[in-house]
Design a protein with these regions (language model features):
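Interfacial loop-to-helix transition and helix-capping segments at the boundaries
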Residues: 14-15, 38-50, 129-143, 183-206, ...
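Short, Lys/Arg-rich, polar N-terminal cytosolic tail immediately upstream
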Residues: 1-14
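Membrane-interfacial entry segments at the cytosolic side of transmembrane helices
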Residues: 161-169, 221-230, 248, 318-321
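Structural signal for the C-terminal ends of transmembrane alpha-helices
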Residues: 62-69, 101-103, 153-161, 209-218, ...
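Alpha-helical transmembrane segments of multi-pass integral membrane proteins
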Residues: 204, 231-343
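Aromatic-anchored segments of alpha-helical transmembrane domains
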Residues: 26-33, 121-124, 171-183, 232-245, ...
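Transmembrane alpha-helical segments and their boundary/interface "anchor" motifs
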Residues: 21, 47-50, 54, 65-102, ...
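Hydrophobic alpha-helical segments with transmembrane-like composition
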Residues: 122-177, 337-339
Length: 355
């Protein structure tokens, strides 16, 4: 989802992680589009996909920038603005288009909703009124920017603390989180536990911790055994647990033990052989992974437009057509955005603002 470059100290991308971005974006996509076909919501896909991307971000940033942080060569200000200007123009474009289309339909937003979304501070306010405004997925960008701000500090701390203290601290944090989370009303789950930047920084920190063990544990290379069968089994087990858990736990905490393990297994699988690794390292999968951020930002609007054009009469046949056309259209739109909007705008910003 976030465009995190791996060229700083580690010159090779972890290709399996790059491709996995698309697979988990697809889960998020299905959570917003499959209900008419499945006749039930697929919130697991959205919440699991979001958890994966926060963990992945912590891991990948550590892989790409961690050595610089350790050596004291990390330029936090440049790092933040580089990533901000990669995210913000596309957010601004889709926010503006969505607001304009909604206005035509008689849907308007107040000044607080507009301001918090434009400034990407909406998740700091514990209210659904400001959370999913216009292009609703932009809340994720607010949390992402906060993770960028605290990355260097978290990396230094989490990679230097003793393992025993880290284990005790994480156990205590999980216990306190669970006790407090259970006091949150169901209606407040999204605007607090699911989206608050301070709480999603836990997932991000788990990604940094996962990188720490990926880098330092001698037996880590044995992890990709039975890849991807173990990983699919883990996700299915979590899916089963998801069905019986309360929203306060399943929206985020449920994924804490699983997503770091899956990220590390994906990373170690990059050096292994097997049909799954070859598939993830293939050019089509690498390309799909490279447009995952554009897919994420564009997909809600594309789903709306496709459903308006194709129509929907409640039948499974038309729901399936809508889903298929939406997925293909979103991928094509994402590639067009990357090639003709994101890349040119980023190049201009890099030349004029980030020299």
């Amino acid at each position: 989802m976030q465009e995190t470059t791996l060229r700083q100290d580690n010159t090779n991308r972890i290709r399996t992680l790059q491709a996995a971005r698309f697979l988990f974006i697809l889960l998020i996509y299905l959570s917003h589009s499959v209900e008419p076909l499945a006749h039930s919501p697929f919130d697991f896909g959205g919440e699991g996909g979001v958890a994966f991307f926060f963990v992945l971000s912590g891991f990948v940033l550590s892989y790409g920038y961690g050595p610089r942080v350790s050596r004291g060569e990390f330029d936090g200000k440049r790092f933040f603005w580089k990533h901000f200007w990669h995210l913000y123009p596309l957010h601004l474009l889709f926010f503006s288009v969505t607001v304009a289309l909604d206005y035509r339909l008689g849907v308007t937003y107040d000044a607080l909703q507009i301001a918090t979304s434009l400034l990407l501070v909406q998740t700091w306010i514990p209210s659904d009124h400001t959370l999913f405004v216009a292009n609703g997925v932009s809340w994720f960008l607010c949390d992402t920017l906060f993770c960028y701000i605290v990355f260097a500090w978290l990396y230094k701390w989490l990679t230097s603390i003793r393992t025993s203290r880290l284990a005790i601290g994480m156990t205590m944090l999980a216990a306190v989180y669970a006790c407090l989370a259970l006091q949150v009303p169901d209606r407040m789950t999204n605007c607090t536990l699911y989206s608050n930047p301070l709480l999603r920084a836990i997932d991000f920190s788990l990604g940094i911790i996962a990188y720490r063990f990926y880098k330092t544990c001698p037996g880590i290379r044995k992890l990709p055994r039975l890849f991807p069968y173990v990983d699919v089994a883990l996700l299915l087990a979590v899916y089963a647990l998801y069905q019986i858990m309360c929203p306060q736990i399943r929206c985020s905490m449920l994924f804490w033990p699983v997503m770091p393990l899956i990220v590390v297994r994906l990373a170690t699988a990059d050096a292994s052989e097997g049909w799954a690794t070859r598939l993830l390292q293939s050019k089509p999968m690498s390309w799909l992974g490279s447009v995952s951020f554009e897919i994420f930002i564009a997909h809600l609007l594309v789903i709306r437009i496709v459903q308006h054009i194709v129509g929907y009469d409640g039948s499974e046949k038309l729901a399936a057509i809508n889903l298929a056309v939406s997925i293909v259209s979103t991928i094509l739109v994402a590639e067009a955005l990357r090639r003709w909007f994101v890349k040119p705008v980023t190049d201009v910003i890099n030349r004029r603002l980030l020299r």
